[in-house]
């Protein structure tokens, strides 16, 4: 830790202090302040605006040391600079404008955002690329980066948060609020899809309001975006966004990017105006716009100041409230605006005590009482709980809670709720009756009622409550059945009665009931007791009886009483009328007549009411067969008026009559199923449903058939729909786990977890992690928690056991095991695999020990190295090498590397690879005998191998050759080859310098980079070897075939080329050359001129290849017997060289004459030989093909040699510039087929080609003859047209016509001495680097119309230049244009009122009436302009007869007039040019409608007498059914219905209409009659037994619940006190609560009573507190005697009318408040001398406001003296 010295003045002290600041530890300074003096004052700010820095110093008071910092910094002047201030960094750069830099003045501009040193002052000279660091650091307070608040202090960039504090990391949220939580804005995202419209050219995409941030819109499609703006002042603007760039629109920066298929619009914000993004439709296709931005919440809650105190003295309280504030208009608005945003949380009111001073003894109005000092706070008060909404199963009970205030007299009044918000509001609802509802409990079944066959069994079902008590209240609908059938396995032999009692006739059953008393059964039933005696002894009285609900318990054979609601069915009458005879007092004498009269009168009384039929009810169905029921009414026979049904005798009620109705079949209709659940909960899911066309044949049989969809006339409802089309909330989406980091011992596996949001269109949007509120799933987890197998842990080698001579080194081994917890533990050594002895002990060798008394001579070890280079050409299993050289080998070869060391023991030899010690492994064997073996080479084996024998060291470099004869890139190694080879014996520095010099041999500018030259000595021969491998050093075709692993491929190669096997017999496995030979070549090349170096390098490489082959063949020839040498001629066919140079190796001089028939047939091959370099001054030039001849003034003769081999012997011919050479006395063909030119002239310049031909093929080689070395270009004068091939290649000078999308290669073969440099031009402009240039050729990939033009190749060297050109024409085949507006406009102009149609490749159709004319358009584009030919019915239209037509607009429009049936059909236009053809079609159809009678429709009924079949009548157009309205004018065929299915119908249930509900609310019952009827073929419906219908269908229900809604009503409380707001003199408002409740008093939501008229909840009332009015005082004196600035004021207050005391102003708010100030003395001043016009001028002067014009003019006198 450095000491803190005493502060001394100067910049050096500040600099050192800041260094101390950066080196201090992070301990708190407060712990160490005891030795420090107090902090000094803050320095002045480094800037006056824009954010600067200020510092403070302190000194150390101790003589020892003080820990901590002696300087501290803070930000200052954090206010925005005015626009004219400019950039702070730019000001510092401009300060150097008057200082010369290198003797010249510059205008300096700032260079910002330097990633390496942002706090240095780097500036750029205006108008140049010169960038200079003018100062090592900028002034304190300069921003590090333009888009960051971080600032530079003492040359270092310090972090600054958005709170402008140093070291703060707080940032702005998406709303622009520093350290905000994002609650002041909301994310808006959406998608807009344009709709093609002929009448609508543009549309609004989205409106982005003022203040929005982070806006991004992406348009995909052909349409175009543009902007409309509107500022807060109402100024409107528009920006068309015509080009890519960054614009300033209404002071908002807009970044716009325009692409061929999309447009991107970005605005960082905040926006300074309202932006409306609009889209301009192009009309070609739909476009989609996706947008996202953060919209500010402009309405926010704002906490108010405290309200006035509730008491003026003696202690009161005051509260705050919250008001909704509009940030745009800066005004308070209604609260509903803030409730619109869920993010807005209304602040809770704050409460504080106030006016705690005691009240004065008397204020003149009242005597102070003790209770005046007590003022209780408002409180919540609740009403009693209402009755529970449910008697069981959990209900709700509620109460009203209101805020009340108690005055000093104890009167309680309701006040606004906000006054009680300082405490939690009491709950207004709570659960109640949460115990279970009564449930049905079924007991065990009784035994079967029969002993054989089928019978019945019964059980008791009781309603049990939650305490286990028998009670009522269970739902009858859910009651389990109490009776079921049972079968006894014993058969019955007694004949049974055919019909059960239930099936007997009604009157027979009634007789049975009268005769038999009701008996108790095992099913609950009503059991009436006997009638009581008549209540009177004479006359008409009543009788009563008890009716019980009883059940027979079969298991106990006892009768149990049940609640009445346990029995089903109507309850028997418990009361009836009775007649006890006349009440005359005398016993009459029996008189039959009188008796008849008496009882006859009673009979007449009974017969006064009777049942009668009154028509039928409405048909129950509108189609498909319904039923009508005869209406039976009880009528008064005398008045014929309806009476109550109980007045008629029930037993005499006539039977029910039913008849069928509306038997016509229902039309086919769509049957729609229910929607399935949505497949997704958000982010657009799908719902499906079944929709099918059905036809109801018979309602009584419920017979329905499914029809084809086209038979339903109505449009088919949708079977699928989107659902939940809203954005999902952001959620975490984890990816798959990655593989474990370990295979055992406890590893870790990771995965990527992204925060994404599934959008309403199904796509996913990746969001920042802060958007996902849920906890983030784990990104990593433990894995492979099992223990690892035991392994050896080896220590370092110990020192040698001796100080000289031979010794040993040892190391220890520990058996270690990695546990699943990740910790290691030592285990028993038996658990580890056996350890080789060599792994724990090895020999070591130090300096030889000196023998005492005898002088000795030191002989250091020596390694016999071989300085050779090896190049493997054929696969071989194993190769042996000696260290000291370089080897370029094929993969999978085994290598044995020997280290022949002398004067050292073999076991002491050690091996290294790339500087790392090598030990034996399964792949590399380090033998103790001084050699190293590598098994099957792989790329990682490439590198530098070093053998060490004591101080002696030798290296061996191994590199691999890939399958494409390229050197394999070496993997990364810890040490470079340069570092390893630098340790070679014999001066590493000199070797390195020599290597670096030789590396430059192949480099001339960019070519060195292109060849990838080596950067270390281990790669110095790589370029030569690569050239040998790539440029035909030996027959590559034979090598490639031999490299194949499959022996079958070798056999194939031998069969195809019989000479290949002979060549391979003489081809070496490895080519060997001396390193010094390669060093000589590199040295020779370094001495050549730079422009000829590449040319000679190719020459020397080819000679090197010949030498290698020749030395190998000569060595092999000496090993063969003479006979073998005579019969083994080998000729190696050369490999064509890129540059024209080649090597020719002939190992037999027998020529073509030798061998005779023994030689195999082979194609011609011209031998490429290398001649000596031509001397320009030679008079006779003799050369071989493949070179360049330069004609000089002294050249007398040129001899061009052409030697070819092949069998049969090839024929030689010569050509010049592609044309056959015309021999003359000056141009001669020699006997050896050489071409000689005597006295060459300029006309002889050109490319001469030797062609060798026999029956098997041909070969050709060219040679260039130039004039004095001038450039020569091989040209071709031909036109190439390409429409199909993917690539085309031509020589310069040709004309190319090709379609788009192909690759075009233009060859520019040049010659000249020195070699000419090629430059390409397009339309006389030089082509840049992006074009593909290779060896003089120009490659144009994927050509388009923009590539069309004139391409020129210029060849230039020291002797001149030559330019040749090729014209490239892009053909565009005929195709349909994407924009059809032009052809449509052409059709509209040709025939404005004529129907028209455009042709298309797939064909279009136009339907016309007979006699009309039509226009057919053929939209086409192409280059050249296609020629259009029209056809009709496949024949040229010019040959069509009977067709009136005109061809217009150069063939693009065909007008056909007076169409008829013969002229309709297919019209086609054929467009063709050089690039292709296109056929488009359109059909003209003459429409004609007619009626068609089809098959009979389905029978309208399946039975009965109403079934008919109607013949189906359809309106057709060209055999296609259309709307029948089209056939309205056609004669309709007469059709007659046919009767069908006239037979008896099976029995079916007939139901009547439902009766009226028994209750209007609270749950009632509806009933209807259900009978079994049978419809005869005659149409008569008769009742039958119910069993006949039960077999067909289940009996319909005859009772159902209705009007289940609760019975509700409005209820209200009593009127509250008259303490509401004043609305006039003496008038206030009082309130009462109005709520919805059931008749039982249960409170319900108000919506339940919405159908009922709601009582008023407020009314006006008389209030003494509202006896108030505004009182004003007199106006004060005017503040000025003249001018425009005088004003006067007065006091305005609200006072009580009786007491004349001031009261709160809100009590007078019902009337307008008088003005409390006004202008005055608005008259011009008479004299214009400088004087004050207001009395406030002294304050103006004290506040230094005189510089403001409005104050200076009014205080002229005072400010003039200032």
From Swiss-Prot:
Q: Give positions of region: Disordered.
A: 1120-1164
Residues forming the Ig-like C2-type domain are 861-963, 1164-1266, 1286-1369, 1395-1485
- What tissue expression does the UniProt record report for this protein? Expressed primarily in adult skeletal muscle.
- Domain (TSP type-1) spans 33-82, 376-424, 436-493, 522-584, 607-665, 666-729, 788-850, 1545-1608, 1666-1726
State the signal peptide span: 1-28
This protein's UniProt keywords: Disulfide bond, Extracellular matrix, Glycoprotein, Hydrolase, Immunoglobulin domain, Repeat, Secreted, Signal
- Its predominant location is secreted
Q: Which intervals hold domain PLAC?
A: 1726-1762
Name the Gene3D superfamilies for this protein. Answer: 2.60.120.830, Immunoglobulins (2.60.40.10), Thrombospondin type-1 (TSP1) repeat (2.20.100.10)
Instruction: Describe how it is modified after translation.
Output: C-, N- and O-glycosylated. O-fucosylated by POFUT2 on a serine or a threonine residue found within the consensus sequence C1-X(2)-(S/T)-C2-G of the TSP type-1 repeat domains where C1 and C2 are the first and second cysteine residue of the repeat, respectively. Fucosylated repeats can then be further glycosylated by the addition of a beta-1,3-glucose residue by the glucosyltransferase, B3GALTL. Fucosylation mediates the efficient secretion of ADAMTSL1.
What is the protein named?
ADAMTS-like protein 1
- The species this protein was found in: Homo sapiens (Human)
* High-level lineage: Eukaryota, Metazoa, Chordata, Craniata, Vertebrata
Q: Which gene encodes it?
A: ADAMTSL1
